[in-house]
């Protein structure tokens, strides 16, 4: 089963009949329109390419416009691809949120919020050094970042200050709380990566 592309609306909570509060993220999943079907013979692998939403005509490039016209669909806000295993799709076909009706858990992929350049304490959860006791300059610095003349360098991958966030993140095995096909909404338990209105990819959980 393939996934779908949606948009993070925000978080809220819903209550069970017993009165238990469940924190949920609301994901709006408009119809995903098939723009291309890739086959083993033509492309070397099987996949389906989809688009969703809409884009102003003035913002669509000529190559993109031709691609959408060939598929017979309205220009969307992007193109995404899902690998397929035996499923049959046709150009212009619409795939809706109700495909998750019988799915218990999903994996959600998005782009995390960008935090800019951050230090080791915020970026890697390093402990801070002494506030006093002889320390007057190095409260939030990393400390030692290497050894001695051997190896005489800082190892690759050393956790240091740098750019935090704005990277692809996947949260696995989030419970599907509700599927509202009429309003095109999917409610999942817990938080998903990204800012409000950012695009997210929802797939059936690989570890479910």
Curated annotation (Swiss-Prot):
Any one of the GO BP annotations: translation
Gene3D superfamilies: 3.30.160.810, Translation factors
Name of one Pfam family that matches: Ribosomal_L3
Post-translational modification: Methylated by PrmB.
Domain of life from the UniProt record: Bacteria
Keyword rRNA-binding among record annotations: yes
GO cellular component: cytosolic large ribosomal subunit
Alphabetical list of InterPro entries matching this protein: Ribosomal_uL3 (IPR000597), Ribosomal_uL3_bac/org-type (IPR019927), Ribosomal_uL3_CS (IPR019926), Transl_B-barrel_sf (IPR009000)
Keyword Ribosomal protein: yes
Molecular function as annotated in GO: rRNA binding; structural constituent of ribosome
PROSITE patterns for this protein: RIBOSOMAL_L3
Keywords recorded for this protein, A-Z: Methylation, Ribonucleoprotein, Ribosomal protein, RNA-binding, rRNA-binding
Residues recorded as bearing N5-methylglutamine in the entry: 149
SUPFAM superfamilies on file: Translation proteins
Oligomeric form and interacting partners: Part of the 50S ribosomal subunit. Forms a cluster with proteins L14 and L19.
Recorded family membership: Belongs to the universal ribosomal protein uL3 family.
Function: One of the primary rRNA binding proteins, it binds directly near the 3'-end of the 23S rRNA, where it nucleates assembly of the 50S subunit.
Protein name in the entry: Large ribosomal subunit protein uL3
């Amino acid at each position: 089963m393939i996934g779908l592309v949606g948009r993070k609306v925000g978080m809220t909570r819903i209550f069970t009949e017993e009165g238990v509060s469940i924190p949920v993220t609301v994901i709006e999943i408009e119809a995903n329109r098939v723009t291309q079907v890739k086959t083993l013979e033509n492309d070397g692998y099987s996949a389906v390419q989809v688009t969703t939403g809409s884009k102003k005509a003035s913002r669509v490039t000529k190559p993109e416009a031709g691609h959408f016209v060939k598929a017979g669909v309205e220009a969307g806000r992007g193109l995404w691809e899902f690998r397929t295993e035996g499923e049959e799709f046709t150009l212009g076909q619409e795939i809706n949120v109700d495909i998750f009706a019988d799915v218990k858990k999903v994996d959600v992929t998005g782009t995390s919020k960008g935090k800019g350049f951050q230090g080791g304490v915020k970026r890697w959860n390093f402990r801070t050094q002494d506030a006093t006791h002889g320390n007057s300059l190095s409260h939030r610095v990393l400390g030692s970042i290497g050894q001695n003349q051997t190896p005489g360098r800082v190892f690759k991958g050393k956790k240091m200050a740098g750019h935090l966030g704005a990277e692809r993140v996947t949260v696995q095995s989030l419970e599907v709380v509700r599927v509202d096909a009429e309003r095109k909404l999917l409610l999942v338990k817990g938080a998903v990566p990204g800012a409000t209105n950012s695009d997210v990819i929802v797939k059936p959980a690989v570890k479910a």
